[in-house]
C-alpha cells in the first residue's frame, strides 16, 4: 500500500515556489508561453487533421430524396431527443410531461446545494451527486431505447 505524501504548506521553500507561480505542475513551467504557444496549436491542428481525414476517407452517404406525399407510419425525432419523446409519449397528461421535463434541470440545479458541505473531488465520497448521475443515466438510456419500440412495449422494453 502506497502512502501519498501531502505537501507541507508551512515549508518556506514550497511557499516561495508557490508565490512565484511555480506550483501549477511538477516541472514548474509557466503556462505562458509554453502551453499556449506550443501545445495548444499542436492539439488544435491534430484535431482538425483527424476530422478532415475522416471526412475525406468516409464521406457522409446521401440518402434517398424526400417524398412529400409519403408519410412514414411513425415519425421519430433525432436520437438525442428519444428520452424526451418517450416521456411525452407515455405520460397521459401532456402538461405533466412538460413539467417532468422541466423538473430534470431543476433537480440538477439543486445537487450542488445539497453537496455544498462536501468538498471532496472523489465521486465515491459524494454519494448524492453520484447516485443522481447514475440513476439519471440509466433512466435516460431506458427511455431512449424505449422510444424506438412500439408504444405497448416501450416502458418494459419487451422484457417483462
Curated annotation (Swiss-Prot):
The chain crosses the membrane at residues 36-56, 95-115, 131-151. CDD domains: cytochrome_b_C (cd00290). GO terms for cellular component: chloroplast thylakoid membrane. GO terms for molecular function: electron transporter, transferring electrons within cytochrome b6/f complex of photosystem II activity; electron transporter, transferring electrons within the cyclic electron transport pathway of photosynthesis activity; oxidoreductase activity. It comes from the Eukaryota. Its main location: plastid. One of its GO terms (biological process) is photosynthetic electron transport chain. It is a multi-pass membrane protein. Disulfide bonds: none annotated. It holds the Pfam family Cytochrom_B_C. It is found in: Plastid, Chloroplast thylakoid membrane. Keywords: Chloroplast, Electron transport, Membrane, Photosynthesis, Plastid, Thylakoid, Transmembrane, Transmembrane helix, Transport. NCBIfam families: cytb6_f_IV. Component of the cytochrome b6-f complex, which mediates electron transfer between photosystem II (PSII) and photosystem I (PSI), cyclic electron flow around PSI, and state transitions. Belongs to the cytochrome b family. PetD subfamily. The 4 large subunits of the cytochrome b6-f complex are cytochrome b6, subunit IV (17 kDa polypeptide, petD), cytochrome f and the Rieske protein, while the 4 small subunits are petG, petL, petM and petN. The complex functions as a dimer. This is Cytochrome b6-f complex subunit 4. It comes from Nephroselmis olivacea. The gene is petD.
Amino acid at each position: 500500500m502506497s502512502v501519498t505524501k501531502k505537501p507541507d504548506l508551512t515549508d518556506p521553500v514550497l511557499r516561495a515556489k508557490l508565490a512565484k507561480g511555480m506550483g501549477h505542475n511538477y516541472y514548474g513551467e509557466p503556462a505562458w508561453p509554453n502551453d499556449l504557444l506550443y501545445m495548444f496549436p499542436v492539439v488544435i491542428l491534430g484535431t482538425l487533421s483527424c476530422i478532415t481525414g475522416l471526412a475525406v476517407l468516409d464521406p457522409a452517404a446521401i440518402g434517398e430524396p424526400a417524398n412529400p406525399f409519403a408519410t412514414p407510419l411513425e415519425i421519430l425525432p433525432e436520437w438525442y431527443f428519444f428520452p424526451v419523446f418517450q416521456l411525452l409519449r407515455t405520460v397521459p397528461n401532456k402538461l405533466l410531461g412538460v413539467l417532468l421535463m422541466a423538473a430534470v434541470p431543476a433537480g440538477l440545479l439543486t445537487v450542488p446545494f445539497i453537496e455544498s458541505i462536501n468538498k471532496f473531488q472523489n465521486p465515491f465520497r459524494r454519494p448524492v451527486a453520484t447516485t443522481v448521475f447514475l440513476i439519471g443515466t440509466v433512466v435516460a438510456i431506458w427511455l431512449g431505447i424505449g422510444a424506438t419500440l412500439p408504444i405497448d412495449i416501450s416502458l418494459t422494453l419487451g422484457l417483462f
